[in-house]
Amino acid sequence: SASGSGESSGMWFGPRL
C-alpha cells in the first residue's frame, strides 16, 4: 500500500515501471 500500484505478499513496489 504505497505510491504506485503493484503490491504483492506484503512487499510494495513503487510506480509501475
From Swiss-Prot:
**Cellular compartment(s):** Secreted
What InterPro entries does UniProt report for this protein, alphabetically? Pyrokinin_CS (IPR001484)
Q: Which residues carry this modification: Leucine amide?
A: L17
Listed under GO cellular component are: extracellular region
Cysteine disulfide partners in this protein: none
This protein's source sits in the domain of life called: Eukaryota
**Residue ranges the record marks as coiled coil:** none
Q: What is the predominant subcellular site recorded for this chain?
A: secreted
Recorded GO molecular functions are: neuropeptide hormone activity
Query: Please, one GO biological process term?
Result: neuropeptide signaling pathway
Keyword Secreted part of the UniProt annotation:
yes
Q: What does this protein do?
A: Myoactive.
Q: Which family does it belong to?
A: Belongs to the pyrokinin family.
Return the protein name.
Pyrokinin-5
Q: Which organism is it from?
A: Therea petiveriana (Domino cockroach)
Lineage, broadest ranks: Eukaryota, Metazoa, Ecdysozoa, Arthropoda, Hexapoda
